[in-house]
């Protein structure tokens, strides 16, 4: 949205650094993920190519180092999914940085889109990577096996379904959900292509037990790879406001009927609660006894603010 010079001048006083205080990011490594990682480590011998999928809004943050121990033994393709939610105006700089980090094969996708042209490129690219790998032995009627890995809620199951939809014209094979960790067990082989015959394994996303720093953890939480209540909707909402104000993404002002951009999360949440009618009854103690008053429901407002961001309703953002 367009913002006047007066408003831009006001925003120049906003925070340039986010104060995390003494907060600690949740240690989130459920049992099924540890089991999945153990099985994943035992699988590369059966796998011809590893497809790593990650959120395009955080192309560098949170890529799991535990995965990378397993990537060197087989060809590797990085898919940055949810590109419809990401500001990719600086795409070339991102690709160059990834190449410096040793990642040469990258595709940007929107796997929920019914006809994403990038999804059509996956099987030809993977086939080429496998057949040109040093360890490849050509055999008649050979079938290939792929493994999809990534942190929670980046679209692994959506990717599998998109590949099947594109190459087999078949329906869903993997359950899809908006919460991290919905794929609870390493699945058996799922066929995704007939020519050549390609099967694919789906694994649980495995978030590393130790996150590099608190800001990396907050970016992961904002993108929904950590269950909200483990971090706190209030802190996620505040970090979201900070992340929108920094690049002057002020779409929330018009959406929630604010007069100007704000750096005060309590003020923003109050405006959201009023706009959406999110209130709650609370008891107030007065000189004449207890009375019940209606107050803004800040938790419900924070939830709507975060949900709107994750659905792309506050504009495209690059967090890294």
From Swiss-Prot:
Protein topology in the membrane: Peripheral membrane protein
GO BP field: mitochondrial translation; regulation of translation
Binding site for GTP: 81-84, 153-158, 205
Gene Ontology cellular-component annotations: mitochondrial inner membrane; mitochondrial matrix; mitochondrial ribosome
Location relative to the cell: Mitochondrion inner membrane
UniProt-listed PROSITE patterns: G_CP (PS51721)
Residue ranges occupied by any CP-type G domain in the UniProt entry: 37-209
A molecular function GO annotation: GTP binding
Keywords associated with the record: GTP-binding, Membrane, Mitochondrion, Mitochondrion inner membrane, Nucleotide-binding, Transit peptide, Translation regulation
Sequence similarity: Belongs to the TRAFAC class YlqF/YawG GTPase family. MTG1 subfamily.
Function of the molecule: Plays a role in the regulation of the mitochondrial ribosome assembly and of translational activity. Displays mitochondrial GTPase activity.
PANTHER family reported for this sequence: MITOCHONDRIAL RIBOSOME-ASSOCIATED GTPASE 1
Protein name from the UniProt record: Mitochondrial ribosome-associated GTPase 1
Encoding gene, per UniProt annotation: mtg1
